[in-house]
């Protein structure tokens, strides 16, 4: 009661600029028989933020309040007091110039540190000079830093290499989470978590494992995400495809073949005809072919990064005679001759 009956000084509450001030002006507890309680908002705070110890169910017509650090009423640990009759505020030994008390007994603490973690006791002085106490708690946690991802292999070979991602830095009392393509980590026997979930290992990577990958670190008060990381998965070449798919040609036309194989990095291409090397190109062009150009046409693909190579062979027949269904072998002159013959026969009928 000392601070209420004989305050050492008179302070003005710095209402302007404080978080939640407007709501606190209007939040005055009506008479109630409910139990006196303290709600910490938030109950888990990040360092440097604010915590409001919000009081619920004040006794009717109290004379004043005192706040204490800890679970008991201890004059040496008194933070601040408030006298309702004259709005007098008295700081105590535990006051740190970061606390603001409001007319409804709520206490705002600014720029909290981990040393502020713990219990706080409110003493309410009633009209009969009897007191009622209640205790609340909150915890302060470090602000989570922005994490980063390190990798033991950013250019893995498909179906051969494994990749281990590590989320940095290592911090205490922190939860590590992983995200792939913006989604939570799927369940897969090829994905393994270790080192307290700090390390994500991809076994036998495939070309679909490009990403992006993100790691998140969180504690009860805050969370932070890393920048996304992608993999450059080396793969292929797959079996090359030769186009067009025609195998019969008529002498005199141009042979124009193209080869393609899925590969990262892009494959190197070469052609051979009947076992004889022709050229290092993706396309093969032979003008005015003859029957001597019949044979096996092989497209060879090589990926120097993966050390792999694939070959596809196409058997091509060049004939002087027209082959039904072999449109690439029909010259324009032959097509016109056929059409004239058909029209003449129709006219005779």
Swiss-Prot record:
Q: What tissues contain this protein?
A: Expressed in leukocytes of chronic myeloid Leukemia patients and bone marrow.
Ranges for the Ig-like V-type domain? 35-142
Question: Which cell locations does it reside in?
Answer: Cell membrane; Cell surface
Q: Reported effect of changing residue 66 to S? A: Inhibits heterophilic cell adhesion
What cystine pairs are annotated?
167-215, 259-299
List this protein's GO terms for biological process.
heterophilic cell-cell adhesion via plasma membrane cell adhesion molecules; immune response
What does the record say about PTM? Answer: Glycosylated.
Domain Ig-like C2-type, chain residue ranges per copy: 145-232, 237-319
Q: Which residues form the propeptide?
A: 321-349
Q: Has the keyword Ribonucleoprotein been applied to this entry?
A: no
Record's family?
Answer: Belongs to the immunoglobulin superfamily. CEA family.
Full protein name: Cell adhesion molecule CEACAM8
Name of the gene: CEACAM8
């Amino acid at each position: 009661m000392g601070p209420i009956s004989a305050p050492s000084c008179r302070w003005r509450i710095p209402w302007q600029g404080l978080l939640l001030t407007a709501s606190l002006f209007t939040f005055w507890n009506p008479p109630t028989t409910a139990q006196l309680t303290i709600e910490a908002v938030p109950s888990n705070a990040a360092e440097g933020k604010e915590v409001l110890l919000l009081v619920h169910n004040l006794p009717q017509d109290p004379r004043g309040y005192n706040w204490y650090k800890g679970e008991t009423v201890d004059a040496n640990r008194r933070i601040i007091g408030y006298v309702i009759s004259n709005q007098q505020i008295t700081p105590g030994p535990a006051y740190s110039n970061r606390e603001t008390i409001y007319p409804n007994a709520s206490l705002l603490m600014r720029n909290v540190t981990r040393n502020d973690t713990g219990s706080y006791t409110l003493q309410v002085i009633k009209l009969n000079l009897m007191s009622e106490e209640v205790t609340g708690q909150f915890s302060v946690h470090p602000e989570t830093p922005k994490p980063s991802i390190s990798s033991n292999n950013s250019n893995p070979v498909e179906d051969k290499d494994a990749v281990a991602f590590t989320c940095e830095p290592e911090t205490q009392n922190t939860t590590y989470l992983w995200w792939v393509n913006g989604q939570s980590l799927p369940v897969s026997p090829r994905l393994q978590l270790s080192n307290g979930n700090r390390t994500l290992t991809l076994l036998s990577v495939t070309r679909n494992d490009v990403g992006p990958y993100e790691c998140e670190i969180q504690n009860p008060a805050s969370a932070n995400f890393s920048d996304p990381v992608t993999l450059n998965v080396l793969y292929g070449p797959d079996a090359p495809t030769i186009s067009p798919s025609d195998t019969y040609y008529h002498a005199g036309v141009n042979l124009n073949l193209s080869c393609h194989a899925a590969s990262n990095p892009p494959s190197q291409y070469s052609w051979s005809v009947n076992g004889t090397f022709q050229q290092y190109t993706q396309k093969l062009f032979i003008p005015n072919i003859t029957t001597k150009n019949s044979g096996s046409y092989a497209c060879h693909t090589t990926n120097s990064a993966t050390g792999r190579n694939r070959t596809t062979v196409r058997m091509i027949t060049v004939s002087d005679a027209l082959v039904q269904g072999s449109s690439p072998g029909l010259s324009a002159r032959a097509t016109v001759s056929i059409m004239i013959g058909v029209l003449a026969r129709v006219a005779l009928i």
